A protein has these predicted regions:
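A short, terminal or domain-edge coil/loop segment
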Residues: 58-61, 90-105, 141-154, 227-245, ...
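GST-like fold's C-terminal all-alpha helical module
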Residues: 107-216, 252
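GST-like domain detector, emphasizing the conserved glutathione-binding G-site
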Residues: 1-133, 248-280
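Long, positively charged, glycine-interspersed low-complexity recognition regions
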Residues: 196-280
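Short, hydrophobic secondary-structure boundary micro-motifs
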Residues: 87-91, 177-180, 205, 227
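Acidic carboxylate-rich catalytic motifs and surrounding loops in phosphoryl-/glycosyl-chemistry enzymes
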Residues: 41-47, 180-182, 231
Length: 280
């Protein structure tokens, strides 16, 4: 088994063929990280149980030499356990815990508001045979008509980018969440933005957002894995008078953002505090 070169992946796709599920995106990157060739089984939101032979109602699912593995986290753990000779995805229990924390924060901070901003696009871009299912299931989830949920998104979209500042700060200090090389933390976080790009018919981030460097590098990994032609650009959000600043223009100062190596390293913060005290 350790010499297996190909793994089958059951995908969740839009009409364009672009993957919509962030969990499938994370698994695609995990398989690429491990160096596997992937045989894709296409499909949309409906018919999953039939496609998987009654084994699962949710995706992703992989098949590795006859062994079926469900759930994106369980798949990543399976790949590390079964193929320890290939690059590691999850470096240990602490990495797994911190990755889950970051992913949960991103879902609360970005996915939840963006889901409401793109829910009609989410339905309209799905396979035509899936429209009725997406409409009924998401309206039951949200308690309102899809069109009503998405309405007014131009007023809501500008309020999401400022909330991502802690994430930008991490990436100002590190090339990848995994350090010098991407790991499963990067893939789980990238999956949030890949999901967004699959449905974002109007951009959620400004053109100059500092996240662009990490996102572009992440989408370019493994031969441009995140560059499906069905993807929409994430960048180009137009701000209006009164909209909040999308990100901090100056690097943060202080203990959370810099290391104390002596007075020279803290001078800028000290001068700022001195000016503030004098102003009062």
């Amino acid at each position: 088994m350790a010499n297996a070169k190909r793994i089958t992946l059951y995908d969740l796709q839009l009409a364009s063929g672009c993957t919509i599920s962030p969990f499938v995106w994370a698994t695609k990157y995990a398989l690429a990280h491990k160096g596997f060739e992937v045989d894709i089984v296409p499909g949309g939101f409906t018919g999953i149980l039939e496609r998987t032979g009654g084994r699962s109602e949710r995706l992703p699912v992989i098949v590795d030499e006859g062994k079926w593995v469900l759930d994106s986290w369980l798949i990543a753990e399976y790949l590390d356990a079964t193929y320890p000779d290939r690059p590691t995805l999850i470096g240990g229990p602490s990495v797994k815990t911190l990755t889950k924390f970051l992913e949960g924060w991103l879902w609360r901070t970005a996915v939840t508001p963006w889901f409401g901003c793109y829910i009609k696009d989410y339905r309209d871009l799905s396979l035509p045979r899936d429209h009725a299912y997406v409409t009924s299931s998401r309206e039951a989830m949200l308690g309102r008509k899809i069109e009503d949920v998405q309405a007014g998104r131009e007023d809501r979209l500008p309020h999401v980018p400022p909330t991502l500042e802690p994430f930008r700060q991490i990436l100002r200090e590190s090339k990848w969440l995994g350090g010098d090389r991407p790991d499963y933390a990067d893939y789980r976080a990238l999956a949030v933005f890949l999901w967004t790009g699959s449905v974002a018919t109007t951009p959620p981030l400004t053109a100059d957002d500092p996240l662009r460097d990490w996102l572009d590098r992440g989408f370019d990994l493994y031969g441009g894995l995140g560059r499906h032609p069905g993807m929409h650009t994430l960048f180009g959000l137009k701000l209006r008078p009164g909209d909040p600043e999308p990100f901090t223009k100056e690097p943060a100062r202080g203990g959370l953002a810099s290391r104390n190596t002596g007075p020279a390293s803290t001078r800028a913060e000290t001068e700022m505090l001195t000016r503030a005290r004098a102003a009062h």
